[in-house]
Design a protein with these regions (language model features):
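Phosphopantetheine-dependent thiolation modules in NRPS/PKS and related acyl-activating systems
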Residues: 2-34, 39-45, 50-83
């Protein structure tokens, strides 16, 4: 799965969970711009695991991560599990 596919899945998940228009989201969009707190972010990351079929080794996210940062984390964890 490439970066753009992961980003599109994240945007769809954010739309489903929080009602945010996917067209208003891009890679630079941050957690605070979406309007979710850190607990909701962790909950969403668990949904990402389920949706994409892998398990995060670590969910070490910086404060207020962008969607690009989350995509990077997803790609790293998916690559480790496919190796």
């Amino acid at each position: 799965m490439d970066r753009e596919q992961i980003l599109e899945r994240l945007k769809a998940l954010i739309h489903e969970r929080f009602g945010v228009d996917p067209a208003s989201l891009n890679g630079a969009t941050t957690q605070s711009e979406i309007g979710i707190d850190s607990l909701l972010m962790v909950d969403m990351m668990l949904d990402v695991e389920t949706e994409l079929g892998f398990t995060f080794e670590s969910m070490d996210l910086p404060r207020n991560p962008s969607l690009d940062t989350i995509v990077d984390l997803v790609q790293r964890n998916m690559a480790k599990q496919q190796a």
